[in-house]
């Protein structure tokens, strides 16, 4: 944040009062408004500049006085209006008793906001407490609010410098140089205003502003707390169960509570209804996880002067509601007089009826508001004003007196939903503006913060072929006494258009009508007169309309808001659990079907697994078909009539697609997602798998055999063996497309699905053009020849054509080829929270089975087994990457695209950081051996000869009898201690010599260590029978690095003789150890039995034979 440097003032004027404070000290209220007259601003600016220059010439010292951000208060002498302050916070309580001389008046500057927060402290802080944060030429300001709940601004010391004063030229006089300096300051001020505005919005959790209207004197931008509003999906059963489980159910039925909330009237106009006030403002101070804060409903509007008595009642905000913040930024470029601004948030419903809206059927489209809420914005209830050019007289103003209440956005009761004329909705909003009440807006940015809470019972944004539910934020006002007509600047940003929210009324209407009705109803004939052809091009701009008689200019802008329904969280609900079906069909076929999830996002691929196991030998499966059914139903506004989306095709015999739809013998739309069959001909699907090597067109038979039961000379008949199969693939759920007027005529009507084939690049190469020799003319003209024969024969692999895996029980490979298709019409979202527009889906798996007739075994009877389960399609923004928490591997990654594990990360100084200890290591006893358990990160072993622990030993039984320590069958391997390198000979074969012999000893050490770390098998010495492992540095006079020399060079391998090998074999067991019992007399004489370890280990790595152990047992007897 920028620092502020203040001008030098007189020596005795470090705490001087400005003219504003002098007037206030006499009890005269002062109301500096950003809408003050321009003439008075210029006079005050000129007089202030002259006074500053005179004070500088009279020898003012470089005494820095704090710069103060204008604050406004409620109550007191200002009568609740905006109040500007140019004094230090320390003098707030002393300004009535202290009167400085006129020449000691300082030239205050504007403080820049670093972080703005809410505070309940009412004690003002002395300015002397900030002296430790001041530097030469830079000043930090920390001003406390004057009232409880007020906001204040604070400047941090690590901010950039923004100088509005000429400290470096304190002896300068007023001259023509001030004009050039003012231009520079104006440019810097404009850049600073943009940065300050963005930080102001960011501090309140808002995104960057988006321009919706711009011309030469006005720009309107919208900033929201998110690109979309995400409403949670909460089942009534789960909600009631969780409430009872947590003890939060007070006996009130949910339906009764919803009816009570919907029964509150919402009035439109200047007195909006259902204003809500947040009672708990502390962040994170929620009552419990289901009750975050409280809203208070009242019937008062946003007018600060409203004297109506509040009639409030508390409404709980639970986890099902979503808070949303909206900021309207009105940037005025020239002094302009505007009326009050009408801001409306509404949800529009449009439903097209094919045969007309019943019962009258005089019109074909329903158009009404499902919810609506209005605000009145003017120069008295803004939250922040940033002037175009910041000066001592034009300072930033934060309106603390504005207390815009948080309001609950919910559905309008059914009886209050009235039909609207879509051609007059904009005019109706403009006509509600009071032209007699105007305000003069000075150049600058006006920020209006609008908090909203969305109820969970409102519908999400819906896009269907004959219905739309969209959310709009609309702003309307009028510019008074504007000369000339201001058209929208061609270089200015265009209004925001959302591709999924049907932003244009004309495109929406054409999409509604032309998508489904071109084959069901004749289009209206357009007159051929010249006026009819050009009348649509004679309208004015959709954002600005001019009234020539009254001198008023209409300003209108709108911003789309997308509301998305999210799937229920897996942590608190079981609604999104995986689907698993396990059944047996007529004691003939057992099938298992598993589907990963129940809530599926569009444009995603979900794995599915199907397992078929025949129970009888004569069952035959010809085809497996997976599809999704979609049913769309519309209900009239009064819940009296309804019709399905497929009725225009299903109930019109003259429709060219009528027979195609009737052949399906079902009323819903069905989209084929996957099909596996044995013949080329079949139903079109998004993915088609054709099996090539099945026997007798049976998907369960792949290994036939010859029938030898016929003893006659007839040819042998081949019989097929039915066996279980497992099919694994991924189902893709394509998203719908926003159809315009042209594309709506190309695709078939709803209910008839057409597909477009996707070419297979693997087949394209095989069936490519023949290789011709390059011609002489082509060579002379510089054309390159065709690819060589080797390059064209290079195989092409496309993974999307190999996603299906079919496994047979016999292990024989199943040969298939794949076909992929793309539907011309995708799938639509589920709509289960709006009673007038209803859309639901089901996943269906169809098995076509053939089985011999029980009465006539020679005849086959064919069956179609249908398994269906409901699924829910949600927005593509609700995919697993956005809804689920990141995995541990993702969280430990150093960067987004970096695949470096945590163990390879570096600290601040660039040193390699070791991985954190595992759970087993953290809870292990400090005195116990340091053991790296299985599944934990490997730890470099310690080779202290005094540690007699299992760290240097092997728990594997195989390697415990593989030979003594240091023994190797390979003469080329050095006779070193195996415990210090690896015991992988028995498990992974002998160790390569390259791990020991290397031109660089460092590489050899690294390889040896890697081998030692990766080997988890160690000797077991728990019974104290094995000898102490001899370290390498004792037996070979080398460093502890596994017997490798520290000097640069190769390692010399001594020739291992037979005697040395035999001597080293004794190190495996303790000296004198034998499996036979030693007699007392032999012990006294020092004679060791012949059946010692030497005889047992005479065969190297082989264990002792039975004939060697039997004599030992006989000797004992």
From Swiss-Prot:
One of its GO terms (molecular function) is ubiquitin protein ligase binding. It holds the Pfam family Arrestin_C. The keyword Cell wall biogenesis/degradation applies. GO terms for cellular component: cytoplasm; cytosol. Keywords: Cell wall biogenesis/degradation, Cytoplasm, Isopeptide bond, Phosphoprotein, Ubl conjugation. One of its GO terms (biological process) is cellular response to starvation. There is a cross-link at residues 191, 577, 651, 712, 794, 807, 1024 (Glycyl lysine isopeptide (Lys-Gly) (interchain with G-Cter in ubiquitin)). InterPro entries: Arrestin_C-like, Arrestin_domain-protein. Residues 11-34, 1027-1059 have a biased composition (Polar residues). It comes from the Eukaryota. It is found in: Cytoplasm. Residues 1-48, 63-155, 275-312, 486-523, 1016-1065, 1079-1117 are annotated as: Disordered. The keyword Acetylation does not apply. Residues 70-81, 117-130, 501-519, 1089-1098 have a biased composition (Low complexity). The modification Phosphoserine is found at residues 18, 115, 140, 286, 527, 550, 775, 1035. PANTHER family: ARRESTIN DOMAIN CONTAINING PROTEIN, PROTEIN ECM21-RELATED. Present with 799 molecules/cell in log phase SD medium. Belongs to the CSR2 family. May be involved in cell wall organization and biogenesis. This is Protein ECM21. It comes from Saccharomyces cerevisiae (strain ATCC 204508 / S288c). The lineage of its organism: Eukaryota, Fungi, Dikarya, Ascomycota, Saccharomycotina. The gene is ECM21.
């Amino acid at each position: 944040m920028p620092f502020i440097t203040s001008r030098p003032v007189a020596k005795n004027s470090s705490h001087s009062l400005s003219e504003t404070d002098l007037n206030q000290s006499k009890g005269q209220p002062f109301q500096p408004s950003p809408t003050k007259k321009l003439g008075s601003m210029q006079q005050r600016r000129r007089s202030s500049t002259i006074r500053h220059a005179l004070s500088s010439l009279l020898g003012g010292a470089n005494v820095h006085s704090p710069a103060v951000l204008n604050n406004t208060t409620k109550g007191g002498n200002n009568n609740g209006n905006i109040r500007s302050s140019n004094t230090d916070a320390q003098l707030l309580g002393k300004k009535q008793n202290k009167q400085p001389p006129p020449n000691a008046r300082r030239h205050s500057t504007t403080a820049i906001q670093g972080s703005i927060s809410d505070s309940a402290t009412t004690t003002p802080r002395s300015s002397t407490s900030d002296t430790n944060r001041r530097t030469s030429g830079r000043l930090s300001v920390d001003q406390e609010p004057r009232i409880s709940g007020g906001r204040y601004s604070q400047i941090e010391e690590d901010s950039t410098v923004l100088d509005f004063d000429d400290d470096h030229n304190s002896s300068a006089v007023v001259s023509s140089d001030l004009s050039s300096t003012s231009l520079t300051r104006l440019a810097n001020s404009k850049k600073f205003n943009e940065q300050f505005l963005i930080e102001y919005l960011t501090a309140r959790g808002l995104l960057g502003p988006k321009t919706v209207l711009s011309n030469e004197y006005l720009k309107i931008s919208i900033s929201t707390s998110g690109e979309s509003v995400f409403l949670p999906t909460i089942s009534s059963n789960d909600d009631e169960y969780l409430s009872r489980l947590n003890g939060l159910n007070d006996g009130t039925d949910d339906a009764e509570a919803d009816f009570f909330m919907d029964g509150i009237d919402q009035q439109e106009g200047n007195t909006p209804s259902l204003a809500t006030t947040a009672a708990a403002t502390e962040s994170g101070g929620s009552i419990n996880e289901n009750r975050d804060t409280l809203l208070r409903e009242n019937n008062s509007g946003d007018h600060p002067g409203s004297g109506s008595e509040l009639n409030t009642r508390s409404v709980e905000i639970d986890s099902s509601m979503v808070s949303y913040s909206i900021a309207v930024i009105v940037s005025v470029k020239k002094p302009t007089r505007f009326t009050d601004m009408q801001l409306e948030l509404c949800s529009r419903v449009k439903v097209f009826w094919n045969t007309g809206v019943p019962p009258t059927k005089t019109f074909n489209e329903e158009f009404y508001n499902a919810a609506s809420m209005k605000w009145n914005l003017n120069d008295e209830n803004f939250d922040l004003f940033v002037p175009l050019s910041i000066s001592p007289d034009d300072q930033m103003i934060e309106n603390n007196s504005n207390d815009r209440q948080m309001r609950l956005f919910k559905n309008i009761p059914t009886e209050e939903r009235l039909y609207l004329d879509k051609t007059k909705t904009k005019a109706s909003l403009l006509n509600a503006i009071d032209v007699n009440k105007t305000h003069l807006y000075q150049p600058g940015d006006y920020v209006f913060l609008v908090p909203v809470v969305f109820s969970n019972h409102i519908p999400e944004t819906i896009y269907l072929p004959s219905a739309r539910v969209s959310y709009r934020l609309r702003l309307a006002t009028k510019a008074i006494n504007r000369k000339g007509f201001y058209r929208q600047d061609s270089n200015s940003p265009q209004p925001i258009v959302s591709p999924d929210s049907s932003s244009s009324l004309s495109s929406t209407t054409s999409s509604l009508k032309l998508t489904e009705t071109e084959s069901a109803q004749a289009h209206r004939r357009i007159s051929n007169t010249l006026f009819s052809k050009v009348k649509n091009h004679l309208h004015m701009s959709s954002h600005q309309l001019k009234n020539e008689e009254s001198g008023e200019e209409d300003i209108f802008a709108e911003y789309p808001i997308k509301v998305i329904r999210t799937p229920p969280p897996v942590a608190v609900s079981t609604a999104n659990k995986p689907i698993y079906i396990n059944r047996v069909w007529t004691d003939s076929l057992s099938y298992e079907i598993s589907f990963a999830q129940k809530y599926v996002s569009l444009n995603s691929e979900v794995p599915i697994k199907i397992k078929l196991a025949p129970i009888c030998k004569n069952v035959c499966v010809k085809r497996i078909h997976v599809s999704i059914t979609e049913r769309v139903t519309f209900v009239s506004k009064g819940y009296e009539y309804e019709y399905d989306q497929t009725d225009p095709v299903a109930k019109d015999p003259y429709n060219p697609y009528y027979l195609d739809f009737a052949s399906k013998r079902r009323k819903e739309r069905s989209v084929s997602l996957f099909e596996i069959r044995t013949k080329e001909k079949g139903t079109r699907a998004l993915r088609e798998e054709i099996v090539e090597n099945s026997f007798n067109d049976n998907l369960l038979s792949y290994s036939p055999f010859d029938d030898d039961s016929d003893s006659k000379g007839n040819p042998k008949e081949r019989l097929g063996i039915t066996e279980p199969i497992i099919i694994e693939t991924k189902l893709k759920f394509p998203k719908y497309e926003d159809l315009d007027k042209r594309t709506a005529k190309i695709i078939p009507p709803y209910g008839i699905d057409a597909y477009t084939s996707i070419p297979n690049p693997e087949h394209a190469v095989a069936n490519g053009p023949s290789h011709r020799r390059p011609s002489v003319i082509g060579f002379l003209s510089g054309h390159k020849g065709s690819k060589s024969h080797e390059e064209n024969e290079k195989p092409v692999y496309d993974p999307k054509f190999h996603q299906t895996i079919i496994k047979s029980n016999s292990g024989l490979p199943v040969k298939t080829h794949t076909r992929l298709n793309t539907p011309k019409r995708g799938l639509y979202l589920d709509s289960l929270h709006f009673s007038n527009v209803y859309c639901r889906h089901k996943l269906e798996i169809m098995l076509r089975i053939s089985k011999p007739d029980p009465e006539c075994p020679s005849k086959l009877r064919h069956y179609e087994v249908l398994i269906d389960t409901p699924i829910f399609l949600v927005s593509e923004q609700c995919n697993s990457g956005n809804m689920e928490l990141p995995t541990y591997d993702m969280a430990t990654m150093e960067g987004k695209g970096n695949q470096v594990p945590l163990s390879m990360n570096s600290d601040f100084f660039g040193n390699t950081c070791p991985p954190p200890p595992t759970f087993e290591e953290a809870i292990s006893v400090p005195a116990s051996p340091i053991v790296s358990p299985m599944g934990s990160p490997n730890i470099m072993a310690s080779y202290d000869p005094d540690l007699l622990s299992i760290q240097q030993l092997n728990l594997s039984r195989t390697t415990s009898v593989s030979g003594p320590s240091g023994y190797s069958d390979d003469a080329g391997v050095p006779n070193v201690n195996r415990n210090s390198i690896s015991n992988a000979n028995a498990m992974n074969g002998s160790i390569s010599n390259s791990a020991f012999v290397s031109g660089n000893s460092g590489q050899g050490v690294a390889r040896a260590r890697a081998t030692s770390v990766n080997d988890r098998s160690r000797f077991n010495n728990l019974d104290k029978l094995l000898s102490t492992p001899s370290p390498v540095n004792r037996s070979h006079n080398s460093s502890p690095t596994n017997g490798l020399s520290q000097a640069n060079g190769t390692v010399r391998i001594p020739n291992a003789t037979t005697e040395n090998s035999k001597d080293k074999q004794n190190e495996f067991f303790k000296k004198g150890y034998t499996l036979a019992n030693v007699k007392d007399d032999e012990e006294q004489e020092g004679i060791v039995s012949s059946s010692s370890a030497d005889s047992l280990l005479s065969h190297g790595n082989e264990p002792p034979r039975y004939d060697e152990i039997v004599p030992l047992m006989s000797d004992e007897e």
